[in-house]
């Protein structure tokens, strides 16, 4: 799946449909990410400013370190987009998908400074939410009722 702009995201129901894929309104999601980026002080990222030329372009890939359930991609997408409106983002897994270790989840291409400055905020959300989603999936799998094909419904008395 390749999604690069808000209209395409909305058309695919990626995260603007409240309650369906992500329980925040578009306005709330944008405000949450803006607050996280401000808290991270990305506007004063002196390391990136000192080591990366302003016109430098970069490509990067978000890859899962271990198997689990990926979550938080809408937040990562928004973090990268808020710091570089010209960034191209290709979402390669659905939010909520089960992934194996070393699975490519998202590909980015854009200004290196924007990508590097948004990276920590994006990864913090994805790692935290993926951990919660993975643990939840494990609990659901553990308590799921398993029935074989020979189980039949009994008539009620």
PLM region spans:
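Acidic/glycine-rich phosphate/pyrophosphate-binding loops and surrounding catalytic core
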Residues: 2-157
């Amino acid at each position: 799946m390749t999604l690069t702009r808000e209209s395409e995201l909305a058309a695919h129901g990626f995260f603007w449909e409240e309650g369906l894929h992500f329980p925040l309104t578009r306005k709330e999601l944008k405000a949450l990410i803006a607050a996280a980026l401000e808290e991270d002080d990305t506007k004063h990222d002196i390391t990136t400013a000192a080591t990366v030329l302003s016109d430098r372009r970069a490509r990067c890939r978000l890859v899962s370190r271990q198997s689990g359930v990926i979550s938080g991609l809408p937040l990562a997408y928004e973090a990268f987009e808020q710091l570089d409106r010209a960034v191209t983002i290709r979402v390669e897994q659905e939010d909520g998908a089960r992934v194996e270790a070393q699975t490519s989840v998202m590909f980015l291409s854009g200004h290196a400074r924007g990508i590097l400055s948004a990276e920590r905020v994006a990864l913090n959300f994805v790692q935290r939410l993926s951990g919660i989603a993975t643990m939840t999936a494990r609990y659901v799998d553990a308590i799921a009722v398993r029935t074989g094909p020979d189980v039949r419904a009994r008539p009620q008395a």
